[in-house]
Amino acid sequence: RRAAGTVRDVGYDTNLDFELLAAMQPDLVLLYGISGENTIVTGKLRELGIPYIYVGDYVEESPLGKAEWLMLAAELCDRRDAGADTLRQIATRYEALRAQVDTTAARPRVMLNTPYRDTWFMPSSRSYMIRLIEDAGGEYVYTQNDSSSSVAVDAEEAYLLANDADVWLNVGACNTLGELTAQNPRFAAVPAVRNRRVWNNNRRQTPAGGSDFWESGVVRPDRVLADLIALLHDDGTADSCCCYYKRLE
């Protein structure tokens, strides 16, 4: 529908075209607010008599908890039973995959992300991504943060953490090892780079050019977990079987 032009662009954040939105007469508006309620938007929607719901999948720390938000779409589309059945299948496969590596002795250490203006943001050890890594039989290199958000780490400390990692994931816009080491020549000496164990979560692209990891991957943690198990334990199938991840060459 987007390609056919039947999905209208009404703006972003507080810059919404409320006149266009009102003319469309929506039954419901779905809102996404990382920093809490946007009272400018919600106040105007109430004034116009337009119902709204906040989608809060981003606050979920559990991969399966995040996937449960597919039930919102199922309810809105009058597909409750189909949604519940899909969610059960996802949960069953996720738990089966986790059980495969639950007792493995090898726990590869994992580094995440790349620097932004000389600052490295390291996720909380309670976060969604770290839960996935642990369920895949990996170990996060940064254990000093158990808050509810990422923390800034200076580039030198992050470089030392990267040197302690077996695998490096989610490297931003980098598509090759050359692009990664261009950010900092010292990255070439990091074990994960030398051993070609750097992976990015941008194998699948959306029609708009974004990473599908942050779209369909949100409600398919079983697929994400399968990717992570394959690449963390280097079973030889990851390059061909991964859905969301690709190895940097």
Model-derived features: positions:
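Short amphipathic alpha-helical segments and helix-helix/interface helices
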Residues: F18, V41-G43, A73, I130, ...
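C-terminal soluble interaction/assembly domains
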Residues: Y142-T143, S148-S240, Y244-E249
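Extracytoplasmic substrate-binding proteins
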Residues: T6, D27-L28, E37-T119, T143, ...
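Alpha-helical segments with a strong preference for the paired helices of cellulosomal dockerin domains
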Residues: N15-A23, G43-E47, L177-F187
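Short, structured coil segments at secondary-structure junctions
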Residues: L48-G49, A136-G137, R194
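Extracytoplasmic
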Residues: G5, L16, A105-R107, V193-N195
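Flexible, glycine-rich surface segments
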Residues: T92, L97-A182
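A short, structured surface patch at a secondary-structure boundary
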Residues: R1-M24, L28-S35
